[in-house]
């Protein structure tokens, strides 16, 4: 492999894959995409219901844990991050949810004039091929997005919608419309029973481009600087250290945890912190590796009187064999769904301008992040604040 290229992209997550596609579309650009993990070309990624298996496999996941949380009984919470082509798009729940219009417009009011809803809408439309009818949706983008029909296939999902309607909530038809307050089935990145990851949308169609090289199972340790200009990377492959250089740009796209980590190892961050580890200072930039903000989900769990949950599928080898044959043969059945495909957006205060709480419904129990199987029929609701205030 040549030790020089025009563009180095560190991290083949969602953004890295899109960048590799865009930059290599110009034949004069040579692009090298580095990924620490392996390919995502496995049935465990393609099968929508197998997401928990991938989410706990160290081959495909960084398996991070938070520092002990003082307001959560000092518990360390599991924080899965994708470690393969596609990053988290290869192991997430496949729910496709745009940000709310008012959230984008609030960013604009802070001075980010390129982040208003009207400015980002063309990119949302550009990326998707949506199966429904709506002039706010895309028709010929690389990512296939479909409205889930899970409520028409499994009675428990339909019962949730009926309950929401009886409780006075709106039942929306398009979860990504301008007015999505209420409950309904979500849009999903599942097409014909198969996960539509970002590599499937952005890398597979261009894998034969001669000016793009994708280097997997390669850990980028740090960025190399010359006169405070990024000129290359130091990386580890097969337990050996190598160096690679960019004629034009080094693009750091390694996610919300690994990007600041690489910056710090490269000498960019809080100087006092870096000195503790003997790292030469390139730029004393406070804030790097701090202020992480995430959404904390709370599970509300109920025992079910009816055997319409996923309990049998998660514990019965015969059921697993039957459903497995349906998926591997026809890409149909229970395994063709993530089962996180129904929920809602609500306001906890009627005076709020738009929803601040999101719900997901799941027809089983998730115990210890899915590491332990349930022992009876049950279901749960996931409650998640859309605009949390806490920061790391």
Regions found by a protein language model. Give the residues of each.
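N-terminal glycine-rich phosphate/pyrophosphate-binding loop and immediately adjacent elements
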Residues: 1-126, 285, 295-304
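A glycine-rich dinucleotide-binding beta-alpha-beta segment and adjacent secondary-structure elements
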Residues: 50-51, 63, 183-191, 215-229, ...
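Glycine-rich loop(s) and the adjacent beta-strand/alpha-helix scaffold that form part
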Residues: 30, 37-42, 223-226, 232-322
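Conserved redox-cofactor binding core of oxidoreductases
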Residues: 108-230, 236, 299-322
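Short, hydrophobic alpha-helix immediately C-terminal to the catalytic nucleophile
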Residues: 17-21, 200, 260, 264
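FAD cofactor-binding and catalytic pocket of flavoenzymes
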Residues: 301-392
């Amino acid at each position: 492999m040549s030790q020089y290229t025009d563009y180095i992209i560190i991290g083949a997550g969602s953004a890295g894959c899109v960048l590799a596609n865009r930059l290599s579309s110009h034949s004069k650009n040579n692009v090298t995409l580095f990924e620490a993990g392996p390919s995502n070309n496995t049935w465990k990624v393609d099968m929508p219901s197998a997401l928990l298996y991938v989410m706990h496999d160290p081959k495909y996941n960084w398996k991070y844990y938070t520092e002990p949380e003082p307001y959560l009984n000092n518990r360390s919470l599991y924080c899965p991050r994708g470690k393969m082509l596609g990053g988290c798009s290869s192991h997430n729940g496949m729910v496709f949810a745009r940000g709310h219009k008012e959230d984008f417009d609030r960013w604009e009011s802070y001075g980010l004039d390129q982040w208003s809803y009207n400015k980002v809408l063309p990119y949302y439309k550009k990326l998707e091929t949506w199966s429904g009818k709506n002039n706010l949706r895309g028709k010929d983008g690389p990512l296939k997005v479909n409205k889930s029909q899970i409520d028409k296939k499994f009675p428990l999902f339909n019962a949730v919608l009926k309950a929401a309607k009886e409780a006075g909530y709106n039942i929306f038809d398009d979860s990504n419309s301008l007015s999505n307050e209420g409950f309904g089935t979500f849009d999903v990145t599942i097409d014909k029973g198969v996960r539509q990851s970002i590599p499937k949308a952005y890398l597979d169609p261009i894998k034969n481009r001669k000016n793009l090289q994708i280097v997997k199972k390669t850990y980028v340790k740090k960025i190399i600087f010359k006169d405070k200009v990024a000129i290359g990377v130091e990386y580890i492959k097969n337990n050996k250290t190598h160096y690679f250089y960019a004629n034009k740009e080094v693009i750091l796209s390694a996610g919300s945890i690994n990007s600041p980590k690489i910056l710090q190892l490269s000498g960019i961050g809080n100087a006092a912190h870096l000195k503790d580890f003997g790292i030469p200072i390139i730029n004393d930039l406070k804030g790097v590796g701090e202020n992480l903000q995430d959404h904390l989900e709370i599970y509300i769990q109920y025992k079910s009187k009816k055997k319409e949950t996923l309990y049998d599928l998660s514990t019965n080898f015969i059921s697993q064999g039957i459903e497995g044959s349906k998926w591997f043969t026809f890409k149909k059945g229970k395994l063709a769904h993530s089962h996180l495909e129904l929920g809602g957006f609500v306001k906890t205060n009627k005076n709020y301008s738009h929803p601040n709480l999101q719900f997901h419904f799941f027809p089983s129990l998730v115990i210890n992040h899915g590491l332990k199987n349930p022992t009876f029929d049950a279901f749960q609701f996931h409650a998640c604040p859309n605009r949390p205030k806490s920061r790391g």
